[in-house]
């Protein structure tokens, strides 16, 4: 029965994505992080911000777990059908496959129309780097990198934790991931208060990122891209990133499409030097964005099928 709930959550994400007008736990988690960060910055200063960052992590993830568990508990007390609906809905909100694909397609269409200014604004909504000076090719690369990375932490990781611990654990993972996306930067403003969140996100994504690489390789073979290069580049360039995890899915995609990703970018006006991922020399355009979206859907479906099969065998 629980497997049916997980399947329903996955299908809902495939069909609906994340409608902007719907209530969403991740939005609430983001607001909680903003509120806690403001309060902690008023109390702690200097080196003590490292301790504040630890508190921020514990409070955010802890409150997410407690509140989501209580909502499920309360719904079960009211009616079983309500419990099922809440269970499925909470699981669905942790998955970002269709939402990610929609955002990438918007950028793809805008680039195809030649509206570079609008494409810069759109890509700025899904990446952390500065986008006001990006070329069309750089926008395409930024989009591809984000789709590749979020195949891991926006789909495969929440699926992984959903199958292990239900929507409560999946939402706790999303809290970790949201913390990293909001405060896990290495610049002067966030280095201290975001240190714990960044490290814990690295730990939480350690297994899912490597699974994402494997599923993307399989997807590359299925889609008749360069599956062999996807395997090789993912392994060869796995350390070519400031994160210990991101280069795995990015390398798999770079190899599959025969392109080069990564390199030096600007974040909040500061230049961050990164090595490149991949060795392909062909120009990158909106065509490669479309191919990356195909990889996203295929790898995510493979992940769900494999996780569901393992769940059936064990339970």
From Swiss-Prot:
The keyword Membrane applies. It is a multi-pass membrane protein. GO terms for molecular function: ABC-type vitamin B12 transporter activity; threonine-phosphate decarboxylase activity. Pathway: Cofactor biosynthesis; adenosylcobalamin biosynthesis. Keywords: Cell membrane, Cobalamin biosynthesis, Membrane, Transmembrane, Transmembrane helix. InterPro entries: Cobalamin_biosynth_CobD/CbiB. GO terms for cellular component: plasma membrane. Belongs to the CobD/CbiB family. Converts cobyric acid to cobinamide by the addition of aminopropanol on the F carboxylic group. This is Cobalamin biosynthesis protein CobD. The gene is cobD.
């Amino acid at each position: 029965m629980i497997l049916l709930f997980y399947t329903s959550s996955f299908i809902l994400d495939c069909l609906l994505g994340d409608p902007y007008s719907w209530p969403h736990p991740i939005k609430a988690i983001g607001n909680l992080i903003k509120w806690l960060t403001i309060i902690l910055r008023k109390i702690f200063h200097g080196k003590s911000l490292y301790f504040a960052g630890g508190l921020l992590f514990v409070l955010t993830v802890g409150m997410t777990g407690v509140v989501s568990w209580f909502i499920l508990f309360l719904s079960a007390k009211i009616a079983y059908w309500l419990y099922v609906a809440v269970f499925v809905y909470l699981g669905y909100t942790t998955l970002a496959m269709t939402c990610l694909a929609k955002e990438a397609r918007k950028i793809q269409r805008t680039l195809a129309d030649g509206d570079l200014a609008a494409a810069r604004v759109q890509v700025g909504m899904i990446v952390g780097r500065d986008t006001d000076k990006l070329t069309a090719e750089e926008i395409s690369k930024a989009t591809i990198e984000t789709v590749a990375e979020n195949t891991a932490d926006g789909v495969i990781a929440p699926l992984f934790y959903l199958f292990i611990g239900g929507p409560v654990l999946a939402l706790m993972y999303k809290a970790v991931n949201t913390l990293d996306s909001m405060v896990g930067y290495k610049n002067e403003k966030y280095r201290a208060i975001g240190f714990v969140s960044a490290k814990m996100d690295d730990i939480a994504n350690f297994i899912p990122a490597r699974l994402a690489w494997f599923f993307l390789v399989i997807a590359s073979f299925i889609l008749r891209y360069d599956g062999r290069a996807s395997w090789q580049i993912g392994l060869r360039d796995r350390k070519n990133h400031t994160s210990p995890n991101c280069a795995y899915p990015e390398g798999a995609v770079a190899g599959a499409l025969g392109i080069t990703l990564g390199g030096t970018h600007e974040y909040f006006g500061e230049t961050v030097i990164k090595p490149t991922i991949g060795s392909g020399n062909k120009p990158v355009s909106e065509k490669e964005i479309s191919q990356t979206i195909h990889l996203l859907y295929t790898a995510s479906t493979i992940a769900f099928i494999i996780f569901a099969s393992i769940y059936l065998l064990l339970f």
